[in-house]
């Protein structure tokens, strides 16, 4: 640390500027939320591809429900404590989110999951803000909290979709 850093003088200002410049070189080392939360499975055969993912940015994270990426965070019920995060309500299995208050008939995909012994929970999220964030009425999330599929209606062939996302094809 420069000795003059605390001085109220031009030497002190120069010392502070020198330290600022040195600290700024570490920005990407510490400000890497884009790397941490923006990791994706693009091109994976166990993801039902849908659209182009957000551009890679090592510093900034852009929440997106495009399959292959980590599911976006959403605060439930206006809370900030345990149980108020959507992540807190996810199980250790595949989870089908029904978003925005539309109770789509998910019986066919639930039946296909039972037939394949794929653990699946259906979670109703009536918040329209969540629907806006996820951009679809239905989102299928893997146990590792990555989006596997999304749509505005149940998949036309749920057995085929499940076979794909569990690697059975």
Which ranges hold each PLM region?
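Helical substrate-recognition/capping region of FAD-dependent monooxygenase/halogenase enzymes
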Residues: 1-169
């Amino acid at each position: 640390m420069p000795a003059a850093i605390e001085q109220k003088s031009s030497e002190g200002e120069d010392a502070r500027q020198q330290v600022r410049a040195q600290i700024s070189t570490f920005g990407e080392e510490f400000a890497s939320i884009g790397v941490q939360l923006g990791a994706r499975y693009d091109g994976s055969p166990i993801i039902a591809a849908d659209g182009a993912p957000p551009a890679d940015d090592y510093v900034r994270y852009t929440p997106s429900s495009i399959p292959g990426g980590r599911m976006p965070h959403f605060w439930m019920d206006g809370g900030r404590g345990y149980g108020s995060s959507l992540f807190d309500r996810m199980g250790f299995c595949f989870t089908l989110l029904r978003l925005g208050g539309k109770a789509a008939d998910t019986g066919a995909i639930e039946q296909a999951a039972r037939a394949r012994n794929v653990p699946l929970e259906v979670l109703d999220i009536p918040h329209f803000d969540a629907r806006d964030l996820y951009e679809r009425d239905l989102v299928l999330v893997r146990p590792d909290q990555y989006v596997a599929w999304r749509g505005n209606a149940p998949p036309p062939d749920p057995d085929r979709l499940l076979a794909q996302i569990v690697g059975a094809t």
